Design a protein with these regions (language model features):
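N-terminal carbohydrate-binding/catalytic regions of secreted carbohydrate-active enzymes
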Residues: 55-95
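Short, acidic loop-to-helix structural element flanking the phosphoryl-transfer center
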Residues: 86-113, 120-124
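A Trp-anchored, charged/polar loop motif used as the substrate-binding/catalytic surface
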Residues: 44-54, 96-97, 170-179
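Phosphate/oxyanion-binding active-site loops and adjacent basic polyanion-contact surfaces
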Residues: 40-43, 90-98, 122, 164-172
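C-terminal cap/substrate-recognition subdomain and adjoining C-terminal extension
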Residues: 26-29, 108-110, 119-229
Length: 229
């Protein structure tokens, strides 16, 4: 016994604060490893809040956020190549505060990129279109100097925007992440309006050491339902 009895035990001993008597609690081993997750929402703010929480848990450099362009960031009305095919209609954000939500994730230190099924021939138009709507992915994308080499008709990457050229989002994204090199992200968060795109990503990446959170962004369907069209 560490303390002698003098009428009563010292309250200090009962609190475990005396040298040699205190029990040392095991040091925390860090956060639980991330798990795969599937969800759906019509609100980018939800994806933003959850991604920022993930950055606090695992570190912003360990979380890659991939946001679909077509009918997720921009209202393309189902036509991914509308502005690239000579149609100069004004393209607006799908959600009024979309650029603000993206900026919040960027300020939290997350790696954030946009992903589109458009081809490399649409790079200039697409980046200009995003910029005119308040989006800038260059600073929050892969580090300066990163080069994703691909042949004509294959996926390409420019200024934080990934052009998959309809080659399959999952295999293309896996190739992009591997090309960026280690350290690989612990978790990839993907938001897109097309379930098949999300399924492709989940199938290609989720069985590796990298886990995936997929979010089906269904605002387009909600808008159609609300207008009765």
């Amino acid at each position: 016994m560490c303390l002698k009895r003098k009428g009563i035990f010292s309250i200090v001993a009962s609190m475990g604060l005396v040298a040699g008597c205190a029990t040392t609690a095991p040091a925390p081993e860090g956060p639980e490893p991330p798990q795969n997750l599937l969800g759906s929402t019509d609100e980018l703010q939800l994806i933003t809040e959850l991604s920022i929480d993930l950055a606090k848990t695992y570190g912003g450099d360990q979380v890659l956020v991939v946001l679909g362009l077509e009918d997720t960031l921009l209202d393309t009305r189902g036509d991914s190549n509308a502005s690239c095919a000579g149609n100069r209609q004004s393209i607006r954000p799908k959600q009024d505060d979309a650029a603000k939500q993206v900026e919040r994730m960027q300020q939290a230190g997350l790696t954030v990129i946009a992903m589109t099924s458009r081809g490399a021939d649409c790079q200039d138009v697409t980046i200009r279109e995003l910029g005119s709507n308040g989006f800038d992915f260059q600073a929050s994308g892969f580090p300066a100097g990163f080069s994703f080499a691909s042949s004509d008709g294959m996926p390409s990457y420019n200024q934080g925007v990934f052009f998959t050229t309809d080659q399959g989002e999952g295999p293309a994204l896996k190739q992009l992440v591997e090309s960026a090199g280690q350290p690989y992200p612990a978790l990839i968060v993907v938001a897109d309006n097309q379930q098949q795109h999300l399924n492709s990503v989940m199938k290609s990446i989720s069985t590796s050491a990298i886990k995936v959170h997929t979010w089906r962004y269904n605002r387009a369907e909600k808008q159609v339902a609300s207008t009765g069209n």
